[in-house]
């Protein structure tokens, strides 16, 4: 059985969404981000990214990780590419060319988009969005996102999905990366194709199931 290490309020959310899309049975092992704890190495601390038991799984001390049989993997976007290929179906590439495009868009999301969207979401997580520094961080990140969003806006003209004529792992990975910036409504209003596309992605039953579980997850775990 697939084991997912992480919590829903983290990058693990995209792996949980993928598992829901594929209809996989999985075990979830809650691993909290160490930054959320006053003393992550205290004897009473819950399992977290600095716990020795988790470091044995992922020496980089980051979530998510998975265990699938004898395979241990890290890096959420790579995990999703693996799960798509492992289980096949419409979320995976149907040709070598499609496989290449799914990988291309996933790497693009990681390199061109996520570095900026993470700045936005962490500003909110740290409750700095109303401070001068926080507002400047968000403004700079939004400016940096204009070019990649313009590229995506053009790519989505006349099409529903990123690759081919169906929802794939590329849509899931990119939608999750962009979700971190959805607090900035003007950014998406300026790119209507992107806005409509991410709404299609987030209307899927598997996404809603993931978000429902995320909403029930105790903050303190």
What are these regions (language model features)?
Residues 19, 66, 79, 102, ...:
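Residue-level signal for nonpolar/aromatic packing positions in well-ordered secondary structure
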Residues 37-39, 200, 220-221:
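Short Asp/Glu-rich motifs
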């Amino acid at each position: 059985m697939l084991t997912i290490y992480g919590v829903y309020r983290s990058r693990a959310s995209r792996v949980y969404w993928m598992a829901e899309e594929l209809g996989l049975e999985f075990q979830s092992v809650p691993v909290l981000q160490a930054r959320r704890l006053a003393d992550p190495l205290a004897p009473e601390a819950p399992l977290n990214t600095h716990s020795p038991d988790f470091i044995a799984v992922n020496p980089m001390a980051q979530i998510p990780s998975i265990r699938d049989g004898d395979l241990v993997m890290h890096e959420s976007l790579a995990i999703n590419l693996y799960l798509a290929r492992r289980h096949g179906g419409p979320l995976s590439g149907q040709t070598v060319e499609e496989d290449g495009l799914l990988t291309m868009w996933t790497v693009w999301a990681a390199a061109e988009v996520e570095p900026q969207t993470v700045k936005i979401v962490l500003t909110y997580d740290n409750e700095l969005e109303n401070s001068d520094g926080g507002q400047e961080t968000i403004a700079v990140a939004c400016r940096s996102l204009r070019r990649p969003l313009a590229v995506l806006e053009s790519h989505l003209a006349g099409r529903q999905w990123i690759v081919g004529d169906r929802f794939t792992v590329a849509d899931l990975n990119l939608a999750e990366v962009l979700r971190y910036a959805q607090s900035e409504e003007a950014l998406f209003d300026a790119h209507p194709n992107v806005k409509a596309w991410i709404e299609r992605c987030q209307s899927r039953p598997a996404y809603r199931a993931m978000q429902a579980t995320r909403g029930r997850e105790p903050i303190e775990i």
